[in-house]
Regions:
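Terminal, non-catalytic protein-protein interaction segments that mediate quaternary/complex assembly
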Residues: 1-329
Length: 329
């Protein structure tokens, strides 16, 4: 997917050295935006392998979002990608799906405010929470021209004290003609590991929602406020603080995809040992690879809440070999 490669090049070429809470340093760029036309195929990366166990994790995470669960007790039976942020009983400080499907609203509103009563169709029984996904589905069926079809996973009071508040925190459905588009806003984006999952998950969501509301799928648009590439810790990370400009000078001189490998070779001769958390070499390798044709996705025609792993089928997927990146926690 060329849009992803352009994003990678943009962050590496224009970003600045930036330490952060994880202890793994980054090359960070402000406010990157791109759009992907989903009519041209499903945007699962082909410049590195994303099927197999990666696809398994992606789909089970997506279904977990839709479940509305605030814990990972079922999810961890299929994938361990959330284990680092959960307690021994699988509970999370913040869970995306919990806010998608069960967003809390105050018991005592201020004078003049308007809130739904307990028997409102989007209010969940037995708790004062609001089902944003059902709201979006109903609005798309009944009022598709609405500019208010917003789903939000950011609760300020929760985010202020959470171990890991939502990174991809808000998305908007927007209909143009007969096509359903989705725009995702993300406060923080790990370019090597997180963003490829985000692109695929929200494109899958757009596909599934479009199918259930009788629209053609349109575009996935993505805005990432802090777009970052992890570049290592200790001496490895510190090297980028001193030498990022030299790397960017070489990137500015690249005239063909193959020349990214020359930059990678230069980098590997200059950097100190300890590359485990350095994502830059792997991303340079991806930049040197030609994107292959996008695959197709098929989602079973059944209620959204009844979807299971086997109901999502990836077809005609071919990719370059996998690249391993270590997660910065």
């Amino acid at each position: 997917m060329q849009e992803y490669l352009d994003l990678v090049d943009s962050v590496l070429s224009e970003g600045a050295y930036k330490p952060n809470r994880t202890g793994v340093d980054t090359v960070s760029a402000f406010s990157r935006h791109y759009e992907v036309d989903l009519q041209e195929g499903f945007p699962l990366l082909t410049t590195k392998q994303m099927d197999g166990y990666r696809w398994n994790s992606l789909i089970h995470e997506f279904l977990w979002y839709l479940s509305g669960e605030e814990h990972i007790r079922s999810l961890r039976e299929e994938t361990g990608i959330w284990d680092a942020w959960a307690d021994d009983e699988g509970r999370l400080d913040t869970a995306y799906g919990r806010f998608w499907r069960r967003f809390p609203y105050p018991e005592d509103g201020l004078d003049g405010e308007t809130w739904p009563d307990e028997d409102h169709r989007w209010v969940n029984e037995d708790e004062r929470t609001f089902d944003q996904i059902q709201y979006a589905l109903d609005q798309l069926r009944e009022n598709p021209r609405s500019r208010r079809i917003v789903v939000n996973a950011w609760h300020p009071a929760n985010a202020a004290v959470s171990t890991l508040p939502p990174c991809h925190y808000s998305f908007v459905f927007n209909v143009q003609g007969d096509r359903l588009n989705v725009h995702l806003t993300q406060r923080s984006g790990d370019i090597a590991l997180g963003v490829p999952f985000n692109v695929a998950a929200y494109s899958l969501l757009a596909t599934a929602i479009a199918q259930r509301t009788d629209f053609e799928v349109g575009k996935f648009a993505h805005t990432v406020v802090d777009s970052h590439v992890y570049c290592g810790k200790g001496d490895r990370g510190a090297w980028y603080e001193e030498n990022l400009s030299a790397l960017q000078e070489r990137l500015a001189g690249v005239e063909s995809d193959e020349e990214y490998r020359d930059v990678k070779s230069w980098l590997e001769t200059q950097t100190p040992e300890g590359e485990g958390y350095d994502h830059v070499p792997g991303l340079l390798e991806q930049l040197a690879r030609e994107p292959l044709d996008r695959p197709e996705i098929r989602v079973a025609d059944k209620p959204l809440d009844e979807l299971a792993y086997e109901d999502v089928e990836l077809r005609d997927y071919d990719a370059h070999p996998g690249i391993s990146f270590k997660v910065a926690e």
